[in-house]
């Protein structure tokens, strides 16, 4: 019986209980709060990384945009930790589900757009019709700008889903090929196993980069509307 390549993306269930809830809540354990007066190396490294990322993301924002700092940092930690947990054996990655990513992207995008129309109504409407547009092109340009606006959350969610899913499928395929080649050619199996290790390391980087890209784009949407 052929194995379904997408079986690893099905939500695992034990005793009738879906594990996705525990997997989504578990990342908070990866970032513990130290009660010591002098932080250990892990907590110090964690704080340094958070300060570095927050400085890069919030440097473009004004005083109103700075109020979104906590939300953006929580978002990048949530996406990054769930992506990393999905690389563990027999685990499930929630960010491979388009429904979940749309559930994150649409409210964040809608909040940014509504904030822009409330605080900068004229500037927000001006995005639909750039200055100097020829009169015959005005109706078409307004339609194009409207479509591009509403496609932003879809592109945001699809980008994250596609990148995470593609990496997991490659790991699954190369891992299966390695197991199949072990009984045929040990040398070839070692080569594919080396490729598998390198690809896994690359996926760790992709998991963090995609969390950064998702949060950075949300930050840019907020910057355009605050």
Swiss-Prot record:
Lipid bilayer topology: Multi-pass membrane protein
InterPro entries from the UniProt entry: ATP_synth_F0_asu, ATP_synth_F0_asu_AS, ATP_synth_F0_asu_bact/mt, F0_ATP_A_sf
Subcellular location field: Mitochondrion inner membrane
Membrane-spanning ranges: 6-26, 68-88, 97-117, 138-158, 164-184, 189-209
The organism's place on the tree of life at top rank: Eukaryota
Subunit and interaction comment: Component of the ATP synthase complex composed at least of ATP5F1A/subunit alpha, ATP5F1B/subunit beta, ATP5MC1/subunit c (homooctomer), MT-ATP6/subunit a, MT-ATP8/subunit 8, ATP5ME/subunit e, ATP5MF/subunit f, ATP5MG/subunit g, ATP5MK/subunit k, ATP5MJ/subunit j, ATP5F1C/subunit gamma, ATP5F1D/subunit delta, ATP5F1E/subunit epsilon, ATP5PF/subunit F6, ATP5PB/subunit b, ATP5PD/subunit d, ATP5PO/subunit OSCP.
Function: Subunit a, of the mitochondrial membrane ATP synthase complex (F(1)F(0) ATP synthase or Complex V) that produces ATP from ADP in the presence of a proton gradient across the membrane which is generated by electron transport complexes of the respiratory chain. ATP synthase complex consist of a soluble F(1) head domain - the catalytic core - and a membrane F(1) domain - the membrane proton channel. These two domains are linked by a central stalk rotating inside the F(1) region and a stationary peripheral stalk.
Similarity comment: family membership: Belongs to the ATPase A chain family.
Name the UniProt record assigns to this protein: ATP synthase F(0) complex subunit a
Organism: Bos indicus
